[in-house]
Amino acid sequence: MARVKRSVNAKKKRREVLNSAKGYRGQRSRLYRKAKEQMLHSKTYAFRDRRARKGEFRKLWIQRINAAARQNDMTYNRLIQGLKLAEIEVDRKVLAELAVSDAAAFTALCEAAKAALPEDVNAPAAS
């Protein structure tokens, strides 16, 4: 049986790890073992943060909507409630974009939400 020599494959594997670890500080970009360990952590962080990013953007959209709603004498909570009662289906991403780029359209949505809200805050919504 022929002898298997692994140097070519091993060097290729190590070179790929070190190439992908470029830009890391210190030993993490130069030593194979440290680079490999850092690459595993990097992939874990990337996987976790791709999912966390969605929540971060939702928080940002809500902050922007709330700031714009307060300029129209409403709160975020009342705006969303009013839009639901008025049966206006606009997601938070679009609302935040309108709040930043098209203030007139956002104001129109606020007025529609105000009109749909009951006069008494504690009164149940009309069925």
Curated annotation (Swiss-Prot):
A GO biological process of this protein is: translation
UniProt keyword RNA-binding, yes or no: yes
Query: Its domain of life?
Result: Bacteria
Mind telling me which CDD domains this protein's record contains?
Answer: Ribosomal_L20
UniProt cross-references to Pfam families, sorted A to Z: Ribosomal_L20
InterPro entries reported for this sequence: Ribosomal_bL20, RIBOSOMAL_L20_CS, Ribosomal_protein_bL20_C
The secretion signal range is none
Query: A Gene Ontology CC term for this entry?
Result: ribonucleoprotein complex
Give this protein's Gene Ontology molecular function annotations.
rRNA binding; structural constituent of ribosome
Q: Could you tell me which SUPFAM superfamilies the record lists for this protein?
A: Ribosomal protein L20
Could you list this entry's UniProt keywords, alphabetically sorted.
Answer: Ribonucleoprotein, Ribosomal protein, RNA-binding, rRNA-binding
Relate the protein's function as given in its record: Binds directly to 23S ribosomal RNA and is necessary for the in vitro assembly process of the 50S ribosomal subunit. It is not involved in the protein synthesizing functions of that subunit.
| Similarity field | Belongs to the bacterial ribosomal protein bL20 family.
Q: What is this protein called?
A: Large ribosomal subunit protein bL20
Q: Which organism is it from?
A: Corynebacterium urealyticum (strain ATCC 43042 / DSM 7109)
